[in-house]
């Protein structure tokens, strides 16, 4: 065993001087006691108030900037949607059906007090019919039918005649005459009922705006009243008596019957084809046969009234456009004479008595329907074409037994008979 080396002796340390005791710190002043508040009891909780609806903040106004319109985009359906018209409410009014120049007309069927309208001239028929439902239930439909067909005055009278027959065809002719008179009054015509003294035959007295030939007439306060049977046939009588009831409004505003056909009729019918060729001019087309039947026995009026009338605007236009295309519209003596030659030579001649057995002036359209015509018919045709094709001012001139046309050509030096107007 290795002997251990004895450790060095430790030098004793001199004890340090004792430190002076620190002065004792002054004791801190005790803090003042804070007075404690008396303990209060908790307050009763307040009653809950109703919740307040929060107000929506106002949206600030946008600045006034012009808005560019946006074209809406229309969606295209993948399948076409049929355009189905709404179904009209069914008309439950009872109808009466009757024939009018081959057309089936249906108008309201109303009760007519037949037993109260069987006497003439005492006004009782008007009072009884005023108490019926005709004006309220039937008159609007009748006026609508008249407007749809664009019937001129005389054909309104014929439609009323046929309607009255359909309503009370089994009644006496006096009752039917009174019903016709009443309906024509409602249509605005100053037509009077009367009866022939010797036979008691009921008649209707028509006031016209024009003179009517080949008809007997009476005169009352300067107004001519022409005599017609209830069937609107001619009746030649030597003596007649009539009485006019006092009418209340609106029947005071009554008028005469105008025979000039101022508006084309809106009536369809079979067609009659024609072709006219003469002097290098050819005109072809068709006319409405039903209209020809309607005017066959039209009351005879002065010849210029036929030139003022238009039955079918399509027929007028058809002829006039073809004439314009072939001779032009320039107003000169050559064109006027060329048109005159066509009118004089394209038609065969016959008097009315030879062709019909009675005097029958033509409307413009009838010249294209019948195989023959006379001077007054050609004059109407020529005067109409002069006016509508070339705008030539002209007059229809009547000589005893003859009709012709005078023409105004101020830029032409023409020798012959003339007059100044």
Where are these regions (language model features)?
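Generic solvent-exposed, charged/amphipathic alpha-helical segments
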Residues: 180, 184, 340-344, 383
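Hydrophobic/aromatic-rich core segments of domains that either
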Residues: 191-222, 319, 323, 327-330, ...
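Extended, non-transmembrane interaction/recognition domains
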Residues: 175-326
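Secondary-structure boundary elements
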Residues: 120-161, 305-370
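Intrinsically disordered, low-complexity proline-rich tandem-repeat tracts
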Residues: 3-75
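Long, contiguous, compositionally biased segments that the model treats as domain-scale units
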Residues: 54-187
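Active-site neighborhood of thiol-dependent amide/isopeptide-bond enzymes
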Residues: 169-180, 351-410
């Amino acid at each position: 065993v290795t002997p251990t080396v004895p450790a060095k002796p430790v030098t004793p340390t001199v004890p340090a001087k004792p430190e002076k005791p620190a002065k004792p710190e002054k004791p801190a002043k005790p803090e003042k006691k804070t007075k404690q508040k008396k303990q209060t009891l908790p307050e009763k909780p307040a009653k809950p108030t109703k919740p307040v609806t929060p107000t929506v903040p106002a949206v600030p106004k946008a600045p006034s900037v012009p808005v560019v319109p946006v074209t809406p985009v229309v969606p295209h359906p993948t399948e076409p949607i049929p355009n189905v018209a709404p179904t009209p409410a069914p008309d439950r009014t009872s109808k009466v059906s009757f024939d009018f120049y081959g057309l089936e007309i249906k108008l309201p069927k109303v009760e007519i007090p037949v037993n109260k309208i069987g006497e003439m001239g005492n006004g009782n028929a008007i009072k009884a019919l005023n108490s019926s439902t005709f004006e309220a239930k039937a008159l609007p439909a009748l006026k609508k039918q008249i407007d749809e067909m664009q019937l001129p005055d005389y054909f309104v009278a014929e439609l009323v005649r046929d309607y009255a027959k359909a309503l009370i065809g089994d009644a006496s002719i006096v009752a039917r005459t009174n019903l016709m008179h009443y309906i024509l009054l409602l249509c605005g015509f100053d037509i009077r009922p009367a009866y022939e003294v010797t036979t008691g035959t009921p008649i209707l007295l028509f006031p016209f705006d024009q003179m009517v030939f080949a008809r007997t007439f009476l005169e009352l306060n300067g107004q001519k009243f022409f005599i017609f049977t209830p069937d609107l046939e001619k009746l030649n009588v030597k003596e007649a008596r009539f009485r006019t009831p006092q009418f209340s409004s609106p029947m005071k505003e009554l008028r005469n019957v105008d025979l000039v056909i101022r508006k084309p009729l809106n009536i369809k019918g079979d067609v009659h084809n024609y072709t006219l060729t003469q002097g290098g001019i050819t005109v072809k087309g068709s006319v409405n046969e039903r209209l020809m039947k309607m005017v066959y026995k039209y009351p005879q009026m002065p010849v210029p009234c036929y030139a003022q009338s238009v039955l079918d605007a399509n027929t007028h236009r058809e002829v006039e456009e073809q004439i314009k295309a072939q001779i032009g519209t320039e107003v000169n003596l050559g064109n006027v004479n060329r048109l005159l030659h066509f009118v004089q030579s394209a038609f065969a001649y016959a008097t009315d008595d030879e062709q019909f057995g009675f005097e029958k002036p033509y409307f413009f359209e009838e010249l294209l329907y019948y195989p023959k015509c006379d001077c007054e018919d050609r004059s109407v045709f020529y005067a109409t074409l002069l006016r509508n094709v070339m705008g030539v001012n002209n007059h229809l001139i009547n000589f005893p037994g003859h009709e012709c046309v005078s023409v105004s050509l101020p830029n032409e030096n023409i020798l012959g008979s003339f007059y100044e107007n």
